[in-house]
Amino acid sequence: MKLKIYTLLIAFCAAWSLHSCDNDDDESIAVPAALQEAFSSKYPNVKNVKWETKAGYYVADFYDGYEASAWFTMDGNWHMTETDIPYTALPDPVKSAFEASDYKTWKRDDVDKLERQDIETVYVIEVENQNQEVDLYYSADGVLIKSVADTDDHESDHLPTTQLPATMKTFIDGKYAGARIVEVDVEDDKNDWNFGFTEVDIIHFDSGLNRNVSKEVLFDKGGEWYSTSWEVRRNELPAAVTNAISVEYAGYQMDDAEYFEMATGTSYYQIELEGNNSPDIDIKVTADGTILK
């Protein structure tokens, strides 16, 4: 009987150790020599380091002026460093953009600096208002890249980005000259229509708008360009678009607007309309004021 119990305990412990290896914060984990050398080379002045494993990466938690976490693969290849910084340490353009945004009155919860392999540094301001929490992603020059509802699922927060295929990089360089890549993600929700598509966020100077714009470039499962979209301010909408809406949708107010370039050759504005006593609706309008049905 004792032997059976002992055997069961061994089996349970083995199963538990396998289950926990995806997120292991045991200080005794073995860190390969190549990884130790890579970390010391990148952060030569850091002394006290605590290693853990997350999502298949080795993560070094340390203090170097601020609390930080550096993500590596087993062979010593660096992928990301996340640094917890005070609001005052943000670049001035980021602070100015935030303080002029719709979120300026929200409570600031946390600020992170994300440095990742082969892409631009991104700053994330976590804000909350009553039961709502939002992560605001900014480039160093103050362009709002995206706003994401915070689900408190910290296991998936700020993971290293997907490696961008060379063919996609070449396409972006050709179509959007001078663009800076700030985010790469593959849609993994099987319930979404674009499951398996690659989303690439870029900062691109738009000569028509005469400003830097955050654009989302979408590639299909085969790696072919599918579409590019970006937010448009109301005062940037063509007069033909606003006139068509005022005629066809009297009583509605324009809210958010996005511009879409499609690989099919069509382009249009997608505009959210708010009605006083009617449900909100989304419409598509071409630059000449044609409303697409």
List each model region and its residues:
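First exposed extracellular module after export/assembly in secreted or surface-exposed proteins
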Residues: 28-293
